[in-house]
Amino acid sequence: MAETENVREIRDENYQSLIPMDEYLAAGVHIGTQQKTEDMKKFIYRVRSDGLYVLDVQSTDERIRAAAKFLSRYDPANVLVVCARQYGQHPAEMFARAIGARHIVGRFIPGTLTNPVYMFFAEPDVVVVTDPIGDAQAVTEAISIGVPVVAMCDTNNMTSNIDLVIPTNNKGRKALALVYWLLAREVSRERNEQGFSYTVNDFESEI
């Protein structure tokens, strides 16, 4: 309970989040790593006694809203979702399915965005990645062709090549499921689409 109270005191007790703050905390969205970068410093609320950095979940909530507005402006067929990280692959695939986007999970083949002769060559208008470290090849190629990148970033990530950061635990199974589900729901709402029936459980990877 103390953790919940601490996070709620971050900036605005009257802030109306997309879901109850307790749900972010229960999924571990706020749990960072024992490393921090200067880039992510502004999204960090505090450091625990064990050296673990804690993310500001209000920033997470705000950035999910911003990312949903941003992504909703694109033709979903031209949105590419990428994830190499194990626990992010199913949520990323479900997110793509929910909004009508393309997805590449597992290994990202070099040249996917830059080599027109490659069988699975893709020309997206925007790329969503789960971790700028694990998905570094996709980020590099997106930058080289001038395509914006939306990324889920933990406390240890560099963000200089990211256009829109969603600060979150990008390693946890439940955290990734919640953030991808919520982002899908908000994109659907921004598009004024009806019938979004997915649940968080639909997005959660099996252990």
From Swiss-Prot:
Cited PROSITE patterns: RIBOSOMAL_S2_1, RIBOSOMAL_S2_2
Taxonomic superkingdom: Archaea
Keyword Hydrolase among record annotations: no
Similarity-based family: Belongs to the universal ribosomal protein uS2 family.
Annotated source species: Methanocella arvoryzae (strain DSM 22066 / NBRC 105507 / MRE50)
Gene3D superfamilies: Glucose-6-phosphate isomerase like protein, domain 1
Lineage: Archaea, Methanobacteriati, Methanobacteriota, Stenosarchaea group, Methanomicrobia
Name used for this protein in its record: Small ribosomal subunit protein uS2
One Pfam family in the UniProt entry: Ribosomal_S2
A GO CC term assigned to this protein in UniProt: small ribosomal subunit
Gene of this entry: rps2
GO biological process: translation
Keywords: Ribonucleoprotein, Ribosomal protein
